[in-house]
């Protein structure tokens, strides 16, 4: 496998591994709507993607969703289930998830119209939070620059 890079470039595809940071590769393995889970770690937070991506061997991808549940609704639902995955992870050194952990999870599935409403609302809130985080990072960089200029 090629070395992953941390900054996206033209012709690069998201590469998901166990870390919180998304890396990028020049090749992809999947072109799907999917929910990605790290297979090892201390927190098991899902990621949502629609499009081309690559996946580390210690990650799970949930895709090919049935007509009863939308991918985005399931993604937001699974974001509330970290306690379940942490509690059911196995291993003494590095907690790991197994396939049966996913298979045993009980999922509450409301009617499709409600799934769309919930997903739309939560998606817009998530986009707003991500935009605010990006602004915060820029402001922190600006602060560091100004502090360096003050003490030269």
What are the roles of these predicted feature ranges?
Residues 1-109:
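DNA target-recognition domains and sequence-specific DNA-contacting regions of bacterial/archaeal
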Residues 106-152:
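Amphipathic alpha-helical coiled-coil/heptad-repeat segments
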